[in-house]
Amino acid sequence: MQPYLPSPLEIVRLAPGDQSIGFDCRAAIDWDSFRVTVHTLDGSLVRTLLTDQERVTISGLANGTNYLLCLTAQRAGRVVAEAPRRLFCPGRFPGTVVNYIHPDDHIYMPSGRSPASPSLLRLPSGRLLASHDVFWGECDQNLSFVFASDDEGVTWRLLSHLQPCFWGKLFYHRGAVYMLAMSAEYGALLLYRSDDGRTWSEPVELLPGGDRLRGGPHKAPMPVIACHGRLWTAIDHGSWTRGGHANGLISVPVDADLMDPSQWRCTGFLPYDPSWPGASRGQSTGCLEGNAVVAPDG
């Protein structure tokens, strides 16, 4: 696994909007100002500005046009760091953009170049946490980011990143935040613990991993529910190269130490049978990414 190592100066969040781009940056060096430039992909300069803010919005851009965002940190008039350049494309988007990665932006390779597997969690304090992994087919698929909002989702900021972490689900239980995730596509099933999403424990392994050829655990950010004194969530096993996935559940007592793998149980995995009553007709190879739900009768 090639680890993600943040640069001394980095654009850590992008939020394109209607004729605009918003971004957050972080610097691990001493600085007194930032110089921001926006170029078209043919090199034409569109905007330039100096700022002492780590959150910037630039407007007056053309929707549907690809741009290159460049950022340098300065101190006493000298450039002390240059951030990796970021691609973006403004446009009208529904809701609020938590984070954005242009499909041709390779900054997070080899994990991938597309945000995926979103998870959203409200803490007892009212703070919202949101996470996504970084995906692309046949890539490492092992990096996730966690963001926070303290104003009901109006604004967001980066809290942390987790690696290895893929297909992750945020959930809260008895005073702690957890991330249930894979180490990679069909990798090991892992569990992380945090107080508030900013810093995380080392992961513990709940199920051993496989690979795309042999098959392995598979999950998505599906609900974690409490029922009959246990926490439950859905888990699959298989791979597309093996023709599909079988389905199961994992669970743990609600009063157990969730970071103790010996406390967890797996039901085993039920292969799909197209002869089941009510099964879909056609070429389906099975079910995937199901929900654990509590029926009305308990």
Label every PLM stretch briefly.
Residues 19-23:
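Structural beta-strand segments of beta-rich domains
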Residues 1-11, 24-70, 74-220, 225-298:
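Beta-rich carbohydrate-recognition and catalytic domains
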Residues 13-17:
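Short, solvent-exposed loop/linker segments at the N-terminal edge
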